C-alpha cells in the first residue's frame, strides 16, 4: 500500500492512515467561550436592560428610561492587567432619560411678574439651576434647564388660573450619561484576567426547564403513581401527582386515583380546586379533558377537606393557606399572590429553552404517533385533511405538522380575566386502544407558535392532559439523564443572569430614591448607584464555583479547561447527592460528551468534556454533526442534531463501506435508533457519523491506538496528558493522531495570524505583519510565568519577507513543535526488568536524559512584597537592614533590591525592607543593642523578603509599581514583584507517564554505559516493567513502541486517528519496510556485563511525558515550626511548614512492635505536651537526660469539651486523691530548677564575647561605658530584699498573663 503524506498546518507533515474519507474539519475548539461571550456583549446585556427599563416610581409619576448604552475602551491592556494584578475590564456607559410628572401644582401669583416669569422663578428655586424660556403658547410654556452636562427641559401646562394662584402640570425631562461600572472583558483566547491571573468560566450542565413525567409503583397497593414536574429556570415549581384515595360517589365509597398539585413544594391541593382558582369551571374542565374517570373522581371530593370547593374566591383562599401556612388573605389578595407566582413575567422565567422543550413535549403531533384518530381533522379553511379512523404514521405526522403550524385544531379556553396570557389550546381525539376502539382520549396540546417565556394556562392544561393520557398508555416518561433534558449554561448566559441580578438591585434602589429624594433636584446620575452591579459581577468572577483559576500547565490543559462541562455549581448538583445514574455514561452522550475523559475522584461523571465536533445551539442543547443520507447515498451535507432530534433517525457508523460515489455497499449495516444498536437495511439509513473520533474529546483523541486500551487506563491517559510539563526542547510525537495541530492552534498559546500578509519584522519579542489593513503587531512572550508556574515562551516560525496566510501559526508556544502539540519526548523504551528497580511501575531512565536536557523544564515563581504606610511611619526599601552582615547583603543593589541574574539560595534576601517600630520603654538589653548599633536598630524592624525553602534559582525579572504611577491598595506605597526562574532536570522521584495511563515514578538514573543496548550499540533510554501491560490491558502502548520505532527508522512522523487508524496488517507492513524483524523484539545486551539477555525484548519508541508531580515540590523538612492553637499539635503539610502526621495506623505499627517508649515520646514531647517539650528542649541544649513526659494538651482539650457538656470531671492519682485539673492548666511551662540564677548569669556574661558574637564593632567609645552601666545594673539585683523581688516576680507574671491573653 502506498503511504500518503498529509500536511498539518504549514510546517508539519505526517503519513496519514485515516480510512474514512470526507472527514469534517474540526471546528474552532474554543467557540463555546468566545461566541457566547460575543452574544452576551451584543444581545444579552440589551435583553436585560429591556427587561428592567423603564423604571417607574411607586406613584407612577417618575419614569427612568434607557436610551442606549456602550462599552468604552479598556482602562488597561492585557499585559498591564497581569503585571499590576488588576482586572482586564472596560467601562459600561448608558444614556438615561428621567421624566418627572407633577400634576396639579399650585404656583402662587406675585404682583409684578407675568405668568412665564412667575413659573420660571418658582421652578428655579426648586431645581437649583438657571432656566431659560424656550417657547410659549397660551397654556403651555417650554423651558431649558441649565444643569451642566445633562440635557434638561421643562414643559408647564397651565390648567387653571385663579385669583391668587395658578394650577399647573409640570413635566421635567433630564437626559444624562451614567457610568454602570467596569465589566471584565474576554481575551481573544477565551479567558478573563482577574487580579492578574487568567481565569476561565466553565460551562454548566443543568436540567432544562420543561415538563418531566415519571411513573412509580405504590408498594402498598401495587398501583402506579403518576408524577409530572413543571420546572422553570426561575420561579414557582408545579408538581402534579396521582394518589389512591377513598371517595364518595353518592352513598357509595370506593378507592379511586385522584390528582393533586403542589405549588412550590407546598402541601397538596386538589387539581379541581387549582383549576377552579384559575377560573376554569367544572363543566369546561370536563369538556377539555373528555370522558375521563380520573378527572371525574378528582372533581367528586377533596379527601383532605371533605368537600369540593367550586367557588373561585374560596378555592384561591384555600390554596393561599396551603402555600403560606398560617396566614390568611382576602380573595383579592390571595388571587393577586397566586397569579403573581405563576404568570408574572418578572418572577417567572421559562427561558427560550423551556418554551422550546414544552412545545416539543406537549405538542399534539408528537403524542399521537401510531394512534388512530377518533374524529376528522380539518385545516384552517375547514377542509377535512384526515378522516376519523386514520392511523397517524410517520408520513401522516409530517403532513399534520404543517397543518397545525398554520393554526388548525386550535380552540379557545375560558379562564380568569385577571390572567393575561394566550388562551389557545390544541385538541385532537384519538382511540386509547387501536384494536378495541371503545374509549376515546382527548390529547390537549399547546399552540406550536407560542413564544411566551413564562407559564400560561394552556401550558398547565396540556401538562395535566399529558399526565391523564399517560394513565391510558399514551405518551412516555422522561429520562432525566438524557441530553435532550439537560442543557448547557454557557458563559454568556451565566453572565447575563448575574447582570440581571445586579440590575434588579439597582432598580430597587432607584425606586426607593424616587420615593424619598427631592423631586425637582433628581437627575439620572444621582439616582443610579452602580455598586450593586459591580459587587455581583466581582463576586461571580472571584468567588463563583464556575469561575476557575485556569489550568495553564500546557496547551492541552488550557484547551480542555475551556471545553469543560460541570454538573456542579449554583443551580446544579452537589457531589454528595449525585447518584450513580447521573454520573454514568448515557447513550445520548454519543458525539456530544466524551465517555472517557472525566476526573477519577469524587467528581467522576459530574465533570465532563465536550466531544471533538460538539457544538452548543441557541437553546443550550449539545449538537453533533451527521452526514445526510439520501437514497443510500452519503452526501457531503452535514446536519447538527440534538439528542432529541437524533432519536427519530437511523444513524450508521462512519466506517461503513462506501463506493467511490458515496453509496452504501452493504445491504445491512450496524446503526443506532432510539438509543438502541440495531441492524438496519441500507435504505433505512438517514444519517452517517462524520468521523469515528466524534465520540471522544480532544485529549482522548490524542491517544494513539485508543481502541486497544482499556477504558480506565484511557481515562488516566487523557487526564495525565493535561499534567505534562512543557520541556525546553519540545518534540511532537512520532506516533500522532492528527488532532495535535488543531489542539495547539486553538489552545491560545500559539500565535496565529489573523490576516494574509508578509512578515515585515521578526525577533524574539514581536512579529510585525504587513497587511492590506496596515502593519499588525504580534507580541511574543519570553519567560512569562503561567498560572501553574511553568514558563510561557514563544518561538517564531516565520522569517522576514515570508508570505503568511490567515490562520497560519506564526510562533510556537510552550509544548508546541512546528504548530503541533508536543507534550513530551520520543524516547527508546525497553519492556524489561532490571535488578528489581522497576518493581511496581517504577521507571529506570538513562543519564542521557539528564545530561542532554531531554526532560528539563523551566519553572518561574513570583514573590511579592508591599511597602506600606504604618502608624509609626512609612516602611522603607533599603540596603541598610539592622543586624544583617555585609555578606548577607552582597546580592542587593543600592536600593535594597536583588540584582537581576543573581543565583539565590533559600534564606537569601530578595528585597531589604525595614518597618518603623513604636516607641516603648526600653529594657536594659534593648538599650545595650541601641548603644552598640546606633539609632537604626532602635527605630526599625527587619521585614525583608527572603527566598523560601525550595525557592532557589536565578533572578529573572523585577517589577516595581509605585503609588504615583499605578493603582495600589490603600496604605500601600509600592508593590515589588521578584521573579525567580528554576531549571529542573529530571531526577529520582519525578513522575512520568505515557499516553495510555502507564504512569510511574523514576527509581533509578543509570549511567549511559550501564543501560542495556541493542546489537548495533544503541542504548535504551527508559526501562519499563513488562508486568505493567497485561493486567492493565492497555495494549496500545505496545503497538505504539513498534510503530514509533518504524517511524524513527524511516524518518517519518505518522498520524493514526482513534478508531480509524492503522490496523495490524498495516503495522506489520511498515515494520517490514523499516527493516524491523522478530515482531519488534530486539536482542538486548547488558551494559555492565556485555552479556545478552536470555530472551529478545520489546524495544521501541514511546512518547513519554514528565508530569507536574516533581519531587522538588514535595520534598520537605522541619525542625521546630508552628503549632495549632487549640490542640498545640504541630501543623501538617509543606505549605504550613508543618510535619508529617503520625496518625492512628502509624500508632498501631509502633504498638505492634512493642516500641512503648518511642510511642510515648511521639505522642507527648514530640507533639502537644507543652511543658514536656520545653523541658526536653532545655535538656538537649544542656546535654542532660530527657525528663519524663507530662500531660498532652489534647487531654486538656478533651476534658474541657467534657466540662462543656456539663460534666464535673476530676483527675485521680494512684492513691485515689483528687487532683485539680485547673492547677495543671495554670502551671508554669518551665520548671523552676531550670531558671538560671542572677548571680550565675552575672558570672557567665562576658562583654567581649557578646560583642564578637554579633559580628559588629562598637560604633563609639561611649558605647563601652554603656556596657559597664548594664553590668552594674546586675549588681543592683543582689541588693534587693525578698519582698521587693516578690513584687518584681508578680509584675512579670502579670505581664506574661497579658501576653497570653493577647
From Swiss-Prot:
E.C. numbers: 2.7.7.6
Keyword hit for Transcription: yes
GO BP of this protein: DNA-templated transcription
Keyword line: DNA-directed RNA polymerase, Nucleotidyltransferase, Transcription, Transferase
Catalysed reaction equations from the record: RNA(n) + a ribonucleoside 5'-triphosphate = RNA(n+1) + diphosphate
Top-level taxon of origin: Bacteria
GO CC, any one term: DNA-directed RNA polymerase complex
InterPro entries (alphabetical): DNA-dir_RNA_pol_bsu_ext_1_sf, DNA-dir_RNA_pol_bsu_external_1, DNA-dir_RNA_pol_su2, DNA-dir_RNAP_su2_dom, DNA-dir_RNAP_su2_hyb_sf, RNA_pol_bsu_bac, RNA_pol_bsu_CS, RNA_pol_bsu_protrusion
Keyword Transferase annotated: yes
Molecular function in Gene Ontology: DNA binding; DNA-directed RNA polymerase activity; ribonucleoside binding
Family: Belongs to the RNA polymerase beta chain family.
Function per UniProt: DNA-dependent RNA polymerase catalyzes the transcription of DNA into RNA using the four ribonucleoside triphosphates as substrates.
Subunit organization: The RNAP catalytic core consists of 2 alpha, 1 beta, 1 beta' and 1 omega subunit. When a sigma factor is associated with the core the holoenzyme is formed, which can initiate transcription.
Protein name as annotated: DNA-directed RNA polymerase subunit beta
Lineage: Bacteria, Bacillati, Mycoplasmatota, Mollicutes, Entomoplasmatales
